[in-house]
Amino acid sequence: MSQTIDLTLDGLSCGHCVKRVKESLEQRPDVELADVTVTEAHVTGTASADALIETIKQAGYGATLSHPKAKPLTESSIPSEALAAVPHELPVATADEESQQLLLSGMSCASCVTRVQHALQSVPGVTQARVNLAERTALVMGSASAADLVQAVEKAGYGAEAIEDDIKRRERQQETAIATMKRFRWQAIVALAVGIPVMVWGMIGDNMMVTDDNRSLWLAIGLITLAVMVFAGGHFYRNAWKSLLNGTATMDTLVALGTGVAWLYSMSVNLWPQWFPMEARHLYYEASAMIIGLINLGHMLEARARQRSSKALEKLLDLTPPTARVVTEDGEKSVPLADVQPGMLLRLTTGDRVPVDGEITQGEAWLDEAMLTGEPIPQQKGEGDSVHAGTVVQDGSVLFRASAVGSHTTLSRIIRMVRQAQSSKPEIGQLADKISAVFVPVVVAIALFSAAIWYFFGPAPQIVYTLVIATTVLIIACPCALGLATPMSIISGVGRAAEFGVLVRDADALQRASTLDTLVFDKTGTLTEGKPQVVAIKTFNGVEEAQALRLAAALEQGSSHPLAHAILEKAGDDKLPQVNGFRTLRGLGVSGEAEGHQLLLGNQALLNEQHVATDDMTAEITAQASQGSTPVLLAIDGKAAALLAVRDPLRSDSIAALERLHNAGYRLVMLTGDNPTTANAIAKEAGIDEVIAGVLPDGKADAIKRLQSQGRQVAMVGDGINDAPALAQADVGIAMGGGSDVAIETAAITLMRHSLMGVADALAISRATLRNMKQNLLGAFIYNSIGIPVAAGILWPFTGTLLNPVVAGAAMALSSITVVSNANRLLRFKPKA
């Protein structure tokens, strides 16, 4: 029997989160209908509450059983789709959904990531935990305290430190990175300083075989190697021991087993040679030292490359000046940035970096906003214009009043979005995570199985071949490359996108954006400037142009429609008559009474509905619409009086940007409420493939659904509040930077500059990032799938050769360095114009 279960949700921040939860629930055969918003879900079907909660958790979110509450009438009248698109509080996280940032230590591979993530998610109050191997950080959403999170990580065998803000995080991360690189460097030098001479000496003269004559010398070398293993490789053994105590296995486990077994075998031969046949008295001290040295060297180079990958975010952090010039009654004074409060008056002069967001109250200046928006051309700002923290005054001097400070500035929001995106995982990375979770135990099993085959079926001396095979398999396997493949590409790709003024909400957005084939553009404010202008006025039935404009403007005083602003601007400062009985007729226009006349102002459908003859206007309506203008018709006392042609010009770069997207293979669609004739004229001018005209605001999401039902992968590009449901419905929502907060918070990708070139840049970076990610994953898979069988001796029957454990150690280190270096290529990526 069907029932409706009410759930309270955690961790949802946008329309796409809502869509993912809804799809996850409705994929269950025991669910008939799922109504989901950002805070709750109402699920109808035969599924149990526990099963539904588990499904939501598998989708990456939190859920608890709630008691149904009656909705207020005002809320229930709003479409659920629109509610789903609007988060509780746009600029900052809600109090119940705080984020904690942790700096981690002791992680070496993807198995460590899985272990830490499970530890964090098991803490009560945690709704979502993202662990980033590349940056050694964790971003935790929920109400859990920092102390509980740190304790959970330490209990799992790793180190953690709570970071309160980005400045402190950056300082500690740099300190840790520099200290780590120095430690890996001297550990590599010490290990290689011992390993290389021993290996060269053994190859030239002694052939690594123990005899009565050199036994004491080899014993001394063995003890020196042990010291190297303790001081230069101690972290491998400590981490492996912690993992063993926690019932897990990591890359450190493989290194510890491989080098430990090689040293123990060599020392056994050294101390009790009589137990081994003459041909089995081969020593592998140099292998232990060389492997530790090479892997430490690889870690050092990897850490250096990881630092480069974070430089885009560090550039954003550098944009904020340490002080600000505050203007008071006593004059100007320089104060620390932390002391600036909203409402304070501040001064900017040439060369200054803007400290906080605000509005100019006096003066004019040219501001360089390139680092914030990707727009290279300086912008002129004057009284009433907004300024944003991080931008630079190139010329001029202004006074401005602070409106947003600290974590509430646009720059802080950008940094927060970039960091969250860099910590996220795309769907393609989930395969690597699943493999990594079982990788080390499987490798150990392969090593033991291979060793057993060589022991029972291999040539003499079996014990030597068994040792070489087991050690080489353990050493060559590299879960580190698998673990780094996805996050390194994400960090580099998201950081590079930020440099072009493209903000990505999460890694999934990048992956989805790389598979798009259809781009849907809202017309007003997206393709066009969003500043309509009256370009022509035609009058009928003896009405004068001035009278028609005055009456039309009077009616539009009560309207918030963009076309109303154009008519009011055309009327200028003329004194307008009082309007009585004003009404907005949805989708048609407005009506009212002024100077004793009954007035109608709107589209042709309005006049037809009110039985106003428009035959005299038909030719002019067609002519204006064919030129891309929107005809606004005025009727006075039931007679056609005037046609006002309103045109919203295309953005200066729209045609070039659309041509670039068209050449990239996308199908371009325009979504507009205009009549088909006007819409087609604009589409022809812009180079649009398909037009969906006459769409009311609440029908945009349905239009997107229809395109998706045709099998298309759809992106919606918009900027207004009424675009929010469509942005949430699309596979990828792209919001223009000048748009509403609702649109920006709903979108998966936000463009900080008012240019469609940003759409092309965003999609190009998305494709490049996914391509880079696939290269990294494929490289890591190929390396392990070829390296492990070769290490197990698969080539022996054909070539009679085995892989040296030292070569295996070098290959392992090289695989991680290759992944990181390939990801760093994204930092130099430039979208083709």
Curated annotation (Swiss-Prot):
Cu(+) 1 binds at C14, C17. The chain crosses the membrane at residues 186-206, 217-237, 253-273, 283-303, 437-457, 463-483, 778-798, 800-820. It is an enzyme of class 7 (translocase). The active site is at D522 (4-aspartylphosphate intermediate). The keyword NAD does not apply. Its EC number is 7.2.2.8. Induction: Transcriptionally up-regulated by CueR in response to copper ions. One of its GO terms (cellular component) is plasma membrane. GO terms for biological process: copper ion homeostasis; viral translational frameshifting. Keywords: ATP-binding, Cell inner membrane, Cell membrane, Copper, Copper transport, Cytoplasm, Ion transport, Magnesium, Membrane, Metal-binding, Nucleotide-binding, Phosphoprotein, Repeat, Translocase, Transmembrane, Transmembrane helix, Transport. Disruption phenotype: Causes a mild defect in aerobic growth on CuSO(4), strongly impairs survival during anaerobic growth on CuSO(4). CDD domains: HMA (cd00371), P-type_ATPase_Cu-like (cd02094). Cu(+) 2 binds at C109, C112. Residues 3-64, 98-161 form the HMA domain. Mg(2+) binds at D719, D723. The keyword Membrane applies. GO terms for molecular function: ATP binding; ATP hydrolysis activity; copper ion binding; P-type divalent copper transporter activity; P-type monovalent copper transporter activity. It catalyses: Cu(+)(in) + ATP + H2O = Cu(+)(out) + ADP + phosphate + H(+). Pfam families: E1-E2_ATPase, HMA, Hydrolase. Disulfide bonds: none annotated. Belongs to the cation transport ATPase (P-type) (TC 3.A.3) family. Type IB subfamily. PANTHER family: ATP7, ISOFORM B, COPPER-EXPORTING P-TYPE ATPASE. This is Copper-exporting P-type ATPase. It comes from Salmonella typhimurium (strain LT2 / SGSC1412 / ATCC 700720).
